[in-house]
Amino acid sequence: MAEPKSFNIPYRSKLTERIEPGQTLIIRGKTIDESKRFNINLHKDSPDFSGNDVPLHLSIRFDEGKIVYNAYTKGTWGKEERAKNPIKKGDDFDIRIRAHDSKFQVSINHKEVKNFEHRIPLNSVSHLSIDGDVVLNHVQWGGKYYPVPYESGIAADGLVPGKTLVVYGTPEKKAKKFNINLLKKNGDIALHFNPRFDEKANGFMCAKPTPGSVVRNSLVNGEWGNEEREGKNPFERLTAFDLEIRNEEFAFQIFVNGERFASYAHRVDPHDIAGLQIQGDIELTGIQVVNNQPAQE
């Protein structure tokens, strides 16, 4: 469930369903140069501080250079847990809160920064509020725990031109590779997208600790075609990513974390993509099929 627009602050929202373990709340926005602090709260029963419990309170503080984590229960604030604030004034940010059975896992700008143990049962969360010195432009929650390897059909007409596959995930600590396959009904692979961490990209001497290449290919009538490997590997171990594969009439347009990565000309009929496979050293947090959005310059 996504709301891709700007929001008034303070922001208040009632969740249409209770948060389940494995789901992720994604919040994107921008701080202002005069920011002192802003807050993200997960509430029980009402999106305010009228006395009901607050299972999670995040206070991003620029005046202290800290992020404060806490919970409010039975009319009392608990003990604060403090950590360094990695967000700078005036910067864009991406904050993710993933729910687990025993904790909230918090990531900022795709890096995990905190595990906050539940003090109030997860199933009590019903509302979200955001307030303070912040510009808010994206709120989304969803996902689940996915098995890997993962295989599924694509609903309705499949991934036809005009549709985008969005994959949210994190390469494992010792990841060597993972792959995403878009399948035709006959089992051919329209697109094999294969980030590899144990190879060097063509034309690049990689100094990062996780160098690699990203192989693109197709399997047609049981035979692999010519590999395409241009470009650095934009994926890093233990760093979350958003991968968009947009199906257009003549090619797949591939974006990683909102940045254009590659274009892959169709080698098979782009109207006949009916299945998805994901394999390898990856933790999946979300999969969506949405309508294509205009490319960002």
Swiss-Prot record:
A beta-D-galactoside binds at residues 224-230. SUPFAM superfamilies: Concanavalin A-like lectins/glucanases. Gene3D superfamilies: 2.60.120.200. Pfam families: Gal-bind_lectin. Keywords: Lectin, Repeat. SMART domains: Gal-bind_lectin (SM00908), GLECT (SM00276). GO terms for cellular component: plasma membrane. It comes from the Eukaryota. GO terms for molecular function: carbohydrate binding; galactoside binding. CDD domains: GLECT (cd00070). InterPro entries: ConA-like_dom_sf, Galectin-like, Galectin_CRD. Residues 11-142, 151-290 form the Galectin domain. PANTHER family: 32 KDA BETA-GALACTOSIDE-BINDING LECTIN LEC-3, GALECTIN. Binds galactose. This is 32 kDa beta-galactoside-binding lectin lec-3. It comes from Caenorhabditis elegans. The lineage of its organism: Eukaryota, Metazoa, Ecdysozoa, Nematoda, Chromadorea. The gene is lec-3.
